[in-house]
């Protein structure tokens, strides 16, 4: 009988401790949530500024994003609309190259409405360290090769790695990774050029 009482007391005590830990954890979460959200937003803004220069827009890019549902935007997860005095001046696409050497490569591609690439950055990848990871800006300047490059119906063949007859460098021992990034950047630009009317409609959903 005494054993039952002791066990019961320990059970109540452990339950109380668990409840107290939950309350403390919840309190810490709510106290730090705003700070965490602010840090994430700052990182997102910094990344967007790497693909769309500040002088292109005076709206809030983070509040000007749309998740496209139309089948014409396959492979595009999100579109940020850069506006200058209410007029569209550029786009940033969150897009995914499905054919990296080690799987998906998530990209952020900045474009102006005429087909000029303003910048490209890698958001996430799983490519081989020392080979495919040269697509990262912190490791090499390769990704900067897209900046100010234009795409149109007359130069589509140039939008490939040199091994495939294009103008973009591949990496020694790693052609698949840069090929995937070049091809997805090209696809993103063509989606933008071929869907101007749809983009105008989508832009009405944001500030």
UniProtKB/Swiss-Prot annotation:
GO molecular function: electron transfer activity; FMN binding
EC number: 7.-.-.-
Compartments, record wording: Cell inner membrane
Primary location recorded for the protein, binned into one broad class: membrane
Cellular-component GO terms for this entry: plasma membrane
Membrane topology: Single-pass membrane protein
One GO term (biological process): electron transport chain
Modified residues (FMN phosphoryl threonine): 175
Keywords (A to Z) from UniProt: Cell inner membrane, Cell membrane, Electron transport, Flavoprotein, FMN, Membrane, Phosphoprotein, Translocase, Transmembrane, Transmembrane helix, Transport
Residues spanning the membrane: 11-31
Organism superkingdom: Bacteria
Cofactor: FMN
One of the Pfam families matching this protein, by short name: FMN_bind
HAMAP family the UniProt entry points to: RsxG_RnfG (MF_00479)
Subunit relationships: The complex is composed of six subunits: RnfA, RnfB, RnfC, RnfD, RnfE and RnfG.
Family the UniProt entry places it in: Belongs to the RnfG family.
PANTHER family in alphabetical order: ION-TRANSLOCATING OXIDOREDUCTASE COMPLEX SUBUNIT G (PTHR36118:SF1)
Free-text function comment from the UniProt entry: Part of a membrane-bound complex that couples electron transfer with translocation of ions across the membrane.
Protein name: Ion-translocating oxidoreductase complex subunit G
Annotated organism of origin: Haemophilus influenzae (strain 86-028NP)
